[in-house]
Structures are given as structure tokens and as C-alpha cells.
């Protein structure tokens, strides 16, 4: 059974998604809704990573326990850049690009959850199937948020 490969890839992609949400939030701190929602959505990915790590341990797969955190220096730099960008006309285009990236990455994570679920079902691994059943809907909600934001912002940004 190659479920260990699915767990490793899912761990990597969820870790990356959480990091991506944090970067977008920090880059767009001037938009408080985006900043706070990105922090919340990154937290969902952090929880998924923790649960994937626990599942990996019970399946003999060693995975890094916690997603890497961005250092204080980089956080300060991004905050200053966010304030500076907030005064320029291009932050809308940057936000669209960031949301597009988040959406596409969340879609890839969604596929990883689906692969794990299908593999777990075929292997009759109820623990992994339950994990996928519980976490995958949150990934779909992360995608939905990014898609909704794209739909709301695109007309204004692309026609101004």
C-alpha cells in the first residue's frame, strides 16, 4: 500500500497552503478582512498538518510536526510593504494574483485529500478515510473563499 506517499504529499501541500495564506494576509495587512481571514484559513491548514502528522505516526510515516512560522523580521518587512502598497493603485492587481495563487494551491490540496480518501477506502483504512472526510470540506471552503474574493474584486480591479 502506498498511502504513505499520499500522506507525505498531503503534508507538504497543506504546509505550503498554510504558509501561502499567511503570506497573502501579511502582504495585504492594509485590508483587515483579508488579513484576518487569511490568518484563520492558515490555521485550518495548520490543524490539518497536525492531524496528518498524527495519522502518519500511526502509519509508520515520520512527518515534521509543525508548519514553519515566518520570522519576526520578514513579518515586519511585509507589514511595511503592505502599508506602502496600500497607497498605490496596483494592490488590487497584486491581491488578484495572490488570490488566484491561493485558489489554485487549495485546489491541488483538495485533489490530494481526494486521493487519500480513495486510497484509504480501497485499503479499508477507516482512520485515514475519516481524516479525509473531516478535513477535505475545510479545504473546499478555503477554495470557495478565494473564488468568492476573486469574483468580487475582479470587476472593480480589472476595469479601473
PLM feature segments, named:
Residues 2-10, 31-51, 98-105, 127-139:
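Alpha-helical scaffold segments that form or flank carboxylate-/histidine-based iron centers
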Residues 139-160:
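Short terminal or interdomain "cap/linker" segment that borders an active site or interface and mediates
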Residues 62-80, 126-137, 156-160:
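Charge-rich, acidic-biased intrinsically disordered regions
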Residues 3-26, 73-123:
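Acidic/histidine-rich alpha-helical segments that form the ligand environment
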Residues 24-34, 59-60, 117-133, 152-157:
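Inter-helical turn/loop segments and adjacent helix faces that build the functional surface
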Residues 32-80, 146-149:
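Conserved alpha-helical segments that form or flank metal/cofactor-binding pockets of metalloenzymes
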Residues 24, 48, 142:
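Short alpha-helical functional segments enriched in proximate histidine and acidic residues
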Amino acid at each position: 500500500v502506498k498511502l504513505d506517499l499520499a500522506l507525505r504529499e498531503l503534508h507538504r501541500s497543506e504546509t505550503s497552503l498554510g504558509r501561502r495564506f499567511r503570506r497573502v494576509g501579511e502582504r495585504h495587512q492594509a485590508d483587515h478582512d483579508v488579513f484576518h481571514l487569511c490568518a484563520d484559513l492558515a490555521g485550518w491548514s495548520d490543524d490539518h498538518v497536525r492531524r496528518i502528522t498524527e495519522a502518519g505516526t500511526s502509519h509508520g510515516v515520520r512527518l515534521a510536526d509543525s508548519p514553519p512560522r515566518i520570522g519576526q523580521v520578514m513579518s515586519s518587512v511585509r507589514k511595511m510593504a503592505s502599508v506602502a502598497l496600500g497607497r498605490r493603485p496596483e494592490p488590487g492587481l497584486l491581491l488578484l494574483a495572490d488570490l488566484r495563487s491561493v485558489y489554485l494551491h487549495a485546489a491541488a490540496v483538495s485533489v490530494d485529500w481526494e486521493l487519500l480518501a480513495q486510497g484509504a477506502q480501497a485499503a479499508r483504512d477507516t482512520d485515514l478515510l475519516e481524516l479525509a472526510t473531516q478535513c477535505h470540506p475545510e479545504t473546499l471552503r478555503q477554495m470557495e473563499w478565494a473564488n468568492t474574493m476573486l469574483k468580487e474584486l475582479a470587476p472593480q480591479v480589472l476595469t479601473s
